[in-house]
Amino acid sequence: MVAQTPSSPPLWLTIIYLLRWHKPAGRLILMIPALWAVCLAAQGLPPLPLLGTIALGTLATSGLGCVVNDLWDRDIDPQVERTKQRPLAARALSVQVGIGVALVALLCAAGLAFYLTPLSFWLCVAAVPVIVAYPGAKRVFPVPQLVLSIAWGFAVLISWSAVTGDLTDATWVLWGATVFWTLGFDTVYAMADREDDRRIGVNSSALFFGQYVGEAVGIFFALTIGCLFYLGMILMLNPLYWLSLAIAIVGWVIQYIQLSAPTPEPKLYGQIFGQNVIIGFVLLAGMLLGWL
């Protein structure tokens, strides 16, 4: 363990920083697809114990993903302005502590998974290698955000099967919506680090699409809309769902217009990430009310 100086935050707070639990937007944006799935599968509000299990599971899993990412990137993050103060990058925590925190998060997620259906449990097991592989994908795969999006999609599969015990056509449509949505907002997020990523030599979708990155984000959001439109049709949801989808479409169109500006403000990328949390909750409300 790295020695704490008088000016350092306490150990427990440094671990919170490592898990990124002090940044709720990143935790919520993983929780949202899981909540979409559990509410649609339950055709309304699911049992509160199950809802709590899913929420805590996504919190543990997102924390695990953040720690694993920082362990992979501990020698890269100090070279990036946005990430250089992360605990492992700043050497505020040792690698051994990081591994220990990751194992605790994994054990917590596994313990919660035992309360789910057998299919959900095995989907949780299948998700772990994808979560662990994502940081490595940045070194060898030109669009690592696709790996992250597939990892995000497991939240849909796990949560839906936790309610029904199986997967349906609607599950896979929602999975597709989640994958495309994640590709969209995480590509925007990666745009903030383009110059650092290019200098260091790691891959990102923002670099891969180059000057057409705004158009790529627009296509990802359009595909998300297509999946959500089809989902509403096959589940025969009521007009309240369609209202929420219309609001989401307006939000995504505005974001696309902002990204199409010749020189977007750097702060725009983080703002769009946060706006997608709001859009996700608007859609969640529509999915809940869509069964009335």
Swiss-Prot record:
CDD domains for this protein: PT_UbiA_COQ2
Cofactor: Mg(2+)
PROSITE patterns xrefs: UBIA
UniProt catalytic activity: all-trans-nonaprenyl diphosphate + 4-hydroxybenzoate = 4-hydroxy-3-(all-trans-nonaprenyl)benzoate + diphosphate
Keywords: Cell inner membrane, Cell membrane, Magnesium, Membrane, Transferase, Transmembrane, Transmembrane helix
InterPro entries: HB_polyprenyltransferase-like, Prenyltransferase, UbiA_prenyltransferase, UbiA_prenylTrfase_CS, UbiA_sf
Organism this protein belongs to: Synechocystis sp. (strain ATCC 27184 / PCC 6803 / Kazusa)
Role played: Catalyzes the prenylation of para-hydroxybenzoate (PHB) with an all-trans polyprenyl group. Mediates the second step in the final reaction sequence of plastoquinone-9 (PQ-9) biosynthesis, which is the condensation of the polyisoprenoid side chain with PHB, generating the first membrane-bound Q intermediate 4-hydroxy-3-solanesylbenzoate.
GO molecular function, one term: protoheme IX farnesyltransferase activity
Similarity field: Belongs to the UbiA prenyltransferase family.
Cellular compartments annotated: Cell inner membrane
The protein, known as: 4-hydroxybenzoate solanesyltransferase
Gene label: plqA
Membrane topology: Multi-pass membrane protein
Chief location of this protein within or outside the cell: membrane
Highest taxon listed in the record's lineage: Bacteria
One GO cellular component, as annotated: plasma membrane
Top enzyme class: transferase
BP-aspect Gene Ontology terms: heme biosynthetic process
This enzyme's EC code(s): 2.5.1.39
Transmembrane segments: 28-48, 49-69, 97-117, 118-138, 140-160, 172-192, 217-237, 239-259, 272-292
